[in-house]
């Protein structure tokens, strides 16, 4: 990931959030955990982060699940929205600057669609849905590399595309809203584009995030709408994370092959998944296995020990090394960053390593020795000076137990 941050200090950033009809799986957290770490690295360099994250709380899947359970869409989405917020806390992910539910902004979304209609980018399809005409956008395909010719509908003599997408779906099934376009609800691509347009006051984002699976059609269609209204791309920089597979197979609810984030947190230290996600370059697929989890469990224990050892040897951190590693994370060069961390570990640069871990927001960096325990380090130092190593080891072991349980 290469970001153009020249002459910028305030960054506007957006990440598509979950569709809240069920619990999120561990793969859903890859982008937001990476963002959480990168944002802290950027703040360390003096950047201010304005981060918008949406909650999709109206969708066909939500309606179907609510009807299946015999409850309202609002009851269902409130439950899973709150569950998602709990997950963010458990995995030590800072809440975004602003979280917005789609249903809170229906009027703004309708206004957005009106602007697209007024500018002549829409038509009604055979179902009487209001649809966006992608052929009106000369650079459609610029985000995903799609060729417009390949998207044309052969049955309409090349005047329409199979990929024209719904702005407003006409329906009275489940939750619906009044609008000039009829009773219905907005399309997913339009929800995100409208929220970005409204919250960031028509400006292009500095960074838009999401999974690689969203490049087409979602990101392409967001960009098309923003370009239609402003003549500018929706984002100057894109960050996309690769797939997270489980035991060699795609992790997906539809395939019944998932590891829920809450189940992961019950079984493992949440820092383990942060370590995994920050060890592999963002776009590279990850195959989550017991062996990989076990390896990173050992790594986290090693990192914890380094933070403990810092109390016994608080030499000055090497600021230039901290900056070098954090810059690599910002650039998405995670493998190189981790190589440098391992070199610093060999050199026993505990202060430098601890500073890096603080910026990557590992939960174990909150582990502390209280003032009373730190006083015991003075006794430890004296015992070392007196070459009473057995008693010194006892104090060290006692302090390690206190540190681990802090």
Swiss-Prot record:
| Names of required cofactors | Zn(2+)
Motif 'HIGH' region: which residue numbers? 18-28
- The record's EC number reads 6.1.1.16
Q: Which UniProt keywords apply?
A: Aminoacyl-tRNA synthetase, ATP-binding, Cytoplasm, Ligase, Metal-binding, Nucleotide-binding, Protein biosynthesis, Zinc
Q: What is the protein name stated in its UniProt record?
A: Cysteine--tRNA ligase
Placement of sequence motif 'KMSKS' region: 250-254
Q: How does it assemble?
A: Monomer.
Organism of derivation? Mesomycoplasma hyopneumoniae (strain 7448) (Mycoplasma hyopneumoniae)
The record's gene field reads cysS
